[in-house]
């Protein structure tokens, strides 16, 4: 079930003395409950503008926005009341590149600030804040001030504050961009933990494909305000269609570069395949199994392993010798083994 539905959403900024800016153009995305949905693109692609339409920090000029089954926007017009929107926003947490902490208050006071309109007693409020600190591994920093914390610790405080009202959705807008690589990994691991333990749906805005690859299960690629490609992480990463996606991913380009360097020429009754498979599900040597089970000779030209959301995924480039019937049996065998097969020509183009 979709917890966020964006249908044909556009955002246009009107300017008096210059041409209008179309920041988001006709974007449709459906995000399922429990997804970690990565939205990736270069600076200025429209990612941050798009994610702000989910909680109406940015109102669309066209399209529909439905969150948690509640209509926010229809045909570019806000249909939810201000009071109801305020209530719904409490169920949509948000973190940013800048931590936006109150420097003159302690860590626990920063978290409590998000609960100032709650009905909790003082004791309940303190208990909840300590639980949130435990959740983000900062139990010993309750009385510290932001200036006494590292960047990663400050982002953990921001995450705890964003979780204060028990949101169903967390919007992460370039939340790791200001952090060093090791701290970035730690924050991404924390987001993955929150997704797993709380059932939290996360929308991850980033220009770093490695962040998406580490924790997301779905991804959309944006360019010039449009989504040029989207789908399951595995499908998009291992068989990218859009040119921009190929630049981000690099894997498809590696296959093409390999073929160019080898300058291969396929013989009669010889086919070239790209094989993609989960190493968790396919533990056997595919080339040996093809010879043993199908009786065809396969040669490996290229091999690579990517780790996508903790799943090791292998990519092989192989040639298979055999007549049309043998090729048909080969394709069926590979499909039955859970291998995704794409036939290529000698230049790496799909057939």
Curated annotation (Swiss-Prot):
How does this protein sit in the membrane?
Peripheral membrane protein
Alphabetized Pfam families for the sequence: ABC_tran, NIL
Q: According to its UniProt record, where is this protein located?
A: Cell membrane
Q: Which SMART domains match?
A: AAA, NIL
Enzyme Commission no: 7.4.2.11
Where is ATP annotated to bind? Answer: 41-48
**Enzymatic reactions:** L-methionine(out) + ATP + H2O = L-methionine(in) + ADP + phosphate + H(+); D-methionine(out) + ATP + H2O = D-methionine(in) + ADP + phosphate + H(+)
GO MF entry, a single one: ABC-type D-methionine transporter activity
- Gene Ontology terms: cellular component: plasma membrane
Q: Can you tell me which family this protein belongs to?
A: Belongs to the ABC transporter superfamily. Methionine importer (TC 3.A.1.24) family.
What role does this protein play? Part of the ABC transporter complex MetNIQ involved in methionine import. Responsible for energy coupling to the transport system.
In Swiss-Prot or TrEMBL terms, this protein is called: Methionine import ATP-binding protein MetN
Organism (species): Lactobacillus delbrueckii subsp. bulgaricus (strain ATCC BAA-365 / Lb-18)
């Amino acid at each position: 079930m979709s917890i966020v539905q964006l249908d044909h959403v556009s955002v246009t900024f009107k300017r008096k003395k210059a041409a209008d800016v179309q920041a988001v153009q006709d974007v449709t995305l459906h995000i399922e409950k429990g997804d970690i949905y990565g939205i990736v693109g270069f600076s200025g692609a429209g990612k941050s503008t798009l994610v702000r339409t989910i909680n109406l920090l940015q109102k669309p000029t066209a399209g529909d926005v439905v969150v948690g089954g509640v209509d926010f926007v229809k045909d570019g017009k806000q249909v939810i009341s201000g009071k109801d929107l305020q209530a719904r926003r409490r169920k949509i947490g948000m973190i940013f590149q800048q931590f936006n902490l109150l420097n003159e208050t302690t860590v626990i006071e920063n978290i409590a600030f998000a609960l100032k309109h709650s009905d909790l007693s003082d004791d309940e409020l303190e208990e909840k804040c300590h639980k949130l600190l435990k959740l983000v591994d900062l139990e010993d920093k309750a009385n510290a001030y932001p200036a006494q914390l590292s960047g990663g610790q400050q982002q953990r405080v921001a995450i705890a504050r964003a979780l204060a009202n028990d949101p169903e959705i967390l919007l992460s807008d370039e939340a790791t961009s200001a952090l060093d690589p090791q701290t970035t990994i730690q924050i991404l691991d924390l987001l993955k933990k929150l997704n797993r333990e709380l059932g939290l749906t996360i929308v991850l805005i980033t220009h770093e494909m490695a962040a998406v690859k580490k924790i997301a299960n779905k991804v959309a690629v944006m360019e010039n305000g449009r989504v040029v490609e989207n789908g399951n992480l595995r499908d998009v990463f291992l068989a990218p269609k859009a040119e921009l996606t190929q630049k981000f991913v690099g894997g498809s380009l590696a296959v093409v570069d390999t073929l160019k360097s080898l300058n291969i020429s396929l013989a009669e009754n010889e086919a070239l395949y790209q094989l993609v498979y989960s190493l968790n599900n396919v533990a056997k040597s595919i080339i040996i199994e093809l010879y043993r089970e199908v009786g065809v000779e396969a040669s490996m030209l290229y091999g690579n392993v990517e780790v996508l959301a903790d799943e090791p995924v292998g990519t092989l480039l192989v040639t298979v010798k055999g007549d049309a019937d043998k090729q048909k049996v080969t394709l069926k065998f590979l499909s039955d083994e859970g291998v995704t097969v794409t036939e290529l020509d000698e230049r790496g183009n799909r057939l």
